Amino acid sequence: MFGFSFRQRKPSSAQTAKERLQILLAHERSSGGSNPDFLPLLQRDILEVVRRHMEIDSDAVDVKLERSDDLSSLEINIELPYAKQLKRA
């Protein structure tokens, strides 16, 4: 009768991507922030996750990391296919 409330849900792809991003950022912080080698790997992983749900070009994902003395900012831009169609209309 109550068996349904004890089932574990499979994490969504968004949750999995969020967890991976948190791990990457924690690793980047612990390395002193001097190693931007994770950015191409992050870009590839994001592209793979988005491609599971829609068809996008390889250059559709842009990842930028900006740093100041007390703040790091990660910007991720993904150009979605329907955005291209809207521009043409």
Curated annotation (Swiss-Prot):
<keyword id="KW-0614">Plasmid</keyword>
<dbReference type="GO" id="GO:0051301">
    <property type="term" value="P:cell division"/>
</dbReference>
<comment type="similarity">
    <text>Belongs to the MinE family.</text>
</comment>
<dbReference type="GO" id="GO:0032955">
    <property type="term" value="P:regulation of division septum assembly"/>
</dbReference>
<keyword id="KW-0131">Cell cycle</keyword>
<comment type="function">
    <text>Prevents the cell division inhibition by proteins MinC and MinD at internal division sites while permitting inhibition at polar sites. This ensures cell division at the proper site by restricting the formation of a division septum at the midpoint of the long axis of the cell.</text>
</comment>
<dbReference type="InterPro" id="IPR005527">
    <property type="entry name" value="MinE"/>
</dbReference>
<dbReference type="Pfam" id="PF03776">
    <property type="entry name" value="MinE"/>
</dbReference>
<keyword id="KW-0132">Cell division</keyword>
<protein>
    <recommendedName>
        <fullName>Cell division topological specificity factor</fullName>
    </recommendedName>
</protein>
<dbReference type="InterPro" id="IPR036707">
    <property type="entry name" value="MinE_sf"/>
</dbReference>
